[in-house]
Regions:
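Nucleotide-activated chemistry modules centered on ATP-dependent adenylation/adenylyltransferase
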Residues: 1-5, 9-194
Length: 194
């Protein structure tokens, strides 16, 4: 059975894919807000993992709504959760199994139990979070066992994280992203498997 894994190119989604590959035919899926936003680094990360990879584009207007939500709320959490739910829902139309790399202590993205149940009731889709029981320290230990990654500040690494494009849209709307997004947020990019 195929499992679509939402893939940013980072260590969490990569580790989720590796763990799921024991039981599923993993396909890595990266979402962007506009056509042509594909990242060569994310494609290279997918190739290094050895899983099929494709990119999808969100419907029009979602990026602007997400940026407006960040500005209105004063923080990105609700916007990132909205975008993540949009990605999972889009894939639920195609796949019986959709997964991501959310961990035990992640605040975002985090889908509430009611949304997960709705995905099953409406689409017959299982939403898997293979890292949900793992705290960050344990994820990092497993990553060092299975993957080689580079790390850096948000925006300095060419990954497929939603936040990068949302930050750019907030800036395009004339706002300082430092007002809304936490400083010193480190992200990762897979270089190769061990």
């Amino acid at each position: 059975m195929n499992a679509a894994v939402l893939f940013s190119g980072g260590k969490d989604s990569a580790l989720a894919a590796v763990l799921l590959s024991r039981d599923y035919e993993v396909e890595l899926i990266t979402f962007h807000f506009r056509p042509g936003q594909e990242s060569g680094e994310v494609t290279a990360a997918a190739e290094a993992l050895g899983f099929p990879h494709r990119t999808c584009v969100f419907g029009p207007g979602l990026l602007s709504r997400a940026a407006d939500m960040v500005i209105a709320c004063g923080f990105p959490n609700d916007a990132i959760n909205m975008v993540h739910l949009s990605a999972v829902t889009a894939l639920a139309h195609e796949y019986q199994v959709v997964a991501d790399g959310t961990r035990f202590n992640d605040r975002v993205p985090r889908l509430p139990r009611a949304e997960v149940q709705r995905l099953w009731n409406r689409y017959g889709c299982s939403y898997l979070r293979p890292l949900l029981g793992y705290p960050k320290a344990e994820v990092d230990r497993l990553v060092t066992r299975f993957l080689v990654v580079s790390q850096g500040e948000t925006g300095s690494i060419g990954n497929g994280d939603y936040e990068r494009e949302i930050r750019a849209e907030v800036r395009a709307k004339g706002h300082d992203t430092g007002t809304f997004f936490p400083g010193h947020h480190e992200q990762s990019l897979v270089i190769r498997k061990r």
